[in-house]
């Protein structure tokens, strides 16, 4: 009997050495089992007549492959299984009375728990859900929590953040700055939220209305020339603005506190 201990388990192909080198030489057997070049040179053989076929290939079972579901159940699937197993009764290895052998799988009590949970939870839920899926409402509540952001890439601050009151306090500085339209990075970030944008718009509209009211007080009714507008702008008391020289008559005077603002 040949020693087959050197063959790897689960090896599907069987190999035959050259006919002029006998099997009983130990150096050839070692080199044949470890050298891939000699394995490729030896060639593939069928495996039935090989002396190590019982090690290289597992023996084929006489029973047909067991179906995945419907085994032992009542109904058409069970009748088909009994009819199929009736032809294999002569071998005597497919269970008694032509039925499938009972399964001893660890998932059987889990399936019973699933059916019980489906009865307790009502017809609206699917029976496939296991009792461990009862944590879904908790995950849903955590997803709706006010402190958590809706998207990781969103740069909009939440109303419940502790830094929002400090940003709200810095909004009146827009009126007292050198250029009313210029904002600090904190004010720019806060103006993205709807509440901050409304406060900022109200403060800017208030500044525009005050400037228009003061312009009507300081300017004469008939003076609409650039020089007169420039003189009236220098004599007025109000927020600091860009000064336009009165000699440049071609340049259009800035009527509003910021070039991007329009009258409302």
Swiss-Prot record:
It comes from the Eukaryota. Residues 154-165 have a biased composition (Low complexity). Residues 57-264 are annotated as: Disordered. Residues 140-153 have a biased composition (Basic residues). This is Putative uncharacterized protein PSMG3-AS1. It comes from Homo sapiens.
